[in-house]
C-alpha cells in the first residue's frame, strides 16, 4: 500500500454530493453517466481523512458508511494496490458503484513529482498503467456479474478537495484541479435483503519503469439491511 504523493492513487474498489442518478438498472448505468460518476467516486474517496478513510483501513460498518449520501452507495478500494477482506452494511434499496482497478492523476505543484498540468498531459502519463490492465473480474455470490455492469471508463476532468489529514501524506489541504481517472468500474442494482459476498479482482502490469505489477483483490461481506423510516 502506498499513501505518499506520487500523483497517482489506485483504488480497486474502494459522497458528500447529491447524485443525479436514482438507481442502477439490471443492465447497469447508461455509459454516458459513468465519466461523471467516476469523478464523484474520487471526490468521495479523497475527501475522507486518512485516519478513517476506508481506502486505507480495513473498514467495518464504522468506516464504510462515512460520507455516503444519496441512492448510490460507494465501495472503497485499497489505495496503492493490495488485498483486503471487508465487512459492510448497506441500506436496502441502494445501488452500488465501485472501481475494480483504476488510476487517478492530478495537477499539483504543491506536492511533486509533477506528472502533467493539462488534461492531455495527465491522461498521457497514466497510459502505461491502463494498457497493462488484465484479469478483471467481479463476482457476486460466486456468480460473474453481467458484462453491462462492468465497464472501462475514462472520467471527465474533475476537481477534488483534500483535508489536512489526507491519503497523500505529502499534499497540503487544498482543492486540486484538473484531475483525471481511467479504469474498470462496476455498478450493481439494489441487492436483496440479507448477506452477500462480493469479490473484486483486477491486475495491471505497466513495467518496471512505471508501477510494475499491481494486483487488486478485495472481498466484501455485505449485509443489506432494511431502512428505518421515522
Language model features: what each stretch is:
Residues 94, 192-199:
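A glycine-anchored, Pro-Gly-centered beta-turn/N-cap motif
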Residues 161-185:
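Aromatic sugar-binding surface patches on proteins
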Residues 203-211:
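Short acidic/polar inter-strand loop motif in beta-rich domains
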Residues 72-163:
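Extracellular-facing segments of soluble proteins and assemblies that are Gly/Ser/Thr-biased and enriched
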Residues 10-22:
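Bacterial N-terminal signal peptides
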Residues 91, 189-193, 213:
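Surface-exposed coil/turn segments at beta-strand junctions on protein surfaces, enriched
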Residues 24-73, 214-217, 222-230:
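N-terminal segment immediately downstream of the Sec signal-peptide cleavage site
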Residues 1-11:
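Bacterial N-terminal signal peptides that target proteins for export
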Amino acid at each position: 500500500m502506498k499513501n505518499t504523493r506520487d500523483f497517482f492513487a489506485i483504488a480497486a474498489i474502494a459522497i458528500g454530493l447529491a447524485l443525479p442518478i436514482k438507481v442502477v438498472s439490471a443492465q447497469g448505468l447508461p455509459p454516458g453517466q459513468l465519466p461523471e460518476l467516476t469523478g464523484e467516486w474520487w471526490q468521495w474517496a479523497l475527501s475522507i481523512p486518512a485516519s478513517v478513510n476506508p481506502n486505507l483501513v480495513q473498514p467495518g460498518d464504522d468506516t464504510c458508511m462515512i460520507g455516503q449520501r444519496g441512492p448510490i452507495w460507494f465501495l472503497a478500494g485499497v489505495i496503492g494496490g493490495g488485498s483486503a477482506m471487508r465487512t459492510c452494511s448497506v441500506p436496502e434499496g441502494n445501488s452500488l458503484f465501485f472501481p475494480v482497478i483504476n488510476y487517478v492523476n492530478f495537477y499539483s505543484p504543491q506536492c511533486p513529482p509533477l506528472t502533467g498540468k493539462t488534461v492531455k498531459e495527465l491522461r498521457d502519463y497514466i497510459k502505461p498503467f491502463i494498457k497493462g490492465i488484465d484479469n478483471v473480474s467481479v463476482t457476486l455470490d460466486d456468480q460473474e456479474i453481467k458484462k453491462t455492469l462492468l465497464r472501462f471508463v475514462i472520467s471527465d476532468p474533475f476537481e477534488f478537495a483534500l483535508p489536512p489529514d489526507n491519503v497523500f501524506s505529502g499534499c497540503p489541504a487544498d482543492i486540486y484541479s484538473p484531475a483525471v481517472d481511467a479504469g474498470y468500474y462496476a455498478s450493481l442494482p439494489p441487492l436483496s435483503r440479507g448477506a452477500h459476498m462480493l469479490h473484486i479482482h483486477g491486475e495491471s502490469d505497466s513495467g518496471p519503469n512505471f508501477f510494475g505489477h499491481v494486483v487488486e483483490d478485495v472481498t466484501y461481506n455485505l449485509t443489506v439491511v432494511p431502512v428505518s423510516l421515522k
